[in-house]
Amino acid sequence: MLIMAEESTIGGFAAEVIDVIGNTGMHGEASQIQCRVLEGRDKGRVITRNCVGPVRIGDILMLLETSREAKKLTTR
């Protein structure tokens, strides 16, 4: 069940997960995802973020800010 709310009541901006890139963190506990911002001044922008916890394509996240992006994953 998706409940849309104003930014001032929850304190975030809705974003839809469009791709799960991979795992990051010391033990692989975080996922790097690409998400499309659904509301606010950056509406429609696709950004890369790190996310902790289970996430899959189509999930809706509430982002506190939409201007910050995660660095791209690198392999060693």
Curated annotation (Swiss-Prot):
A Gene Ontology BP annotation from the UniProt entry: ribosomal small subunit assembly
Ribonucleoprotein keyword on record: yes
GO cellular component entries: cytosolic small ribosomal subunit
UniProt keyword terms in alphabetical order: Ribonucleoprotein, Ribosomal protein
Gene3D superfamilies: Nucleic acid-binding proteins
Keyword Disulfide bond recorded: no
Molecular function via GO: structural constituent of ribosome
PANTHER family: 40S RIBOSOMAL PROTEIN S28, SMALL RIBOSOMAL SUBUNIT PROTEIN ES28
Family of the protein in this entry: Belongs to the eukaryotic ribosomal protein eS28 family.
Name of the protein in question: Small ribosomal subunit protein eS28
Upper taxonomic lineage: Archaea, Methanobacteriati, Methanobacteriota, Stenosarchaea group, Methanomicrobia
